[in-house]
Amino acid sequence: MLYAGLLTAVFYLTFDSSRGDEINQLNDTITSKVSSDTRIFCTYSLSSSADNAYLFWYKQTPGSSPRYLLHRMKASTDELRSDETEAMFSSQLDTSQKMTSLTIVNTQLCDSAVYLCALSTTVLSLHYCLLQ
């Protein structure tokens, strides 16, 4: 097989423009060599009313639903992941460049999939009801 040593991943755009928030993947397809590290990039923009953003990464294999891998919050340096997400996946967030990336360490053929980035914004407000 000619391409047995290559990984091909296809990426789709996911965005939420209802409030002026948007996320875009920089490449439609990335080809990597087996055992190398692969990095996937998304840029985002937030409306002026969006104080915080959650940037998610999903993996979808043929015939399956997207599987949540991990996410980062713009206002935090913590990376949150599902219990099943392997240590080979990590994400980075550069708020000055408005960019997030997913790194796949030691890429293997079984990592061939569609990887999706997604953006969700929240408005945090607290409501109190005082009772006497």
Label each residue range with its predicted role:
Residues 47-86:
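N-terminal V-set
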Residues 26, 45, 60, 69-72, ...:
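Small disulfide-bonded, cysteine-rich extracellular recognition modules and tandem repeats
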Residues 27-31, 78, 82-110:
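Extracellular beta-strand/loop-rich beta-sandwich domains predominantly from IgSF
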Residues 33-35:
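Solvent-exposed, conformationally flexible loop/turn segments
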Residues 37-47, 54-61, 103-105, 111-121:
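Structural signature of extracellular immunoglobulin-like
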Residues 23, 66, 89:
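Short clusters of hydrophobic/aromatic residues that line enzyme substrate/ligand-binding pockets
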Residues 7, 13, 69-70, 102:
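Generic leucine side-chain signal with a strong bias for well-ordered alpha-helical environments
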Residues 1-29, 119-132:
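N-terminal Sec-dependent signal peptide, specifically the hydrophobic helical h-region
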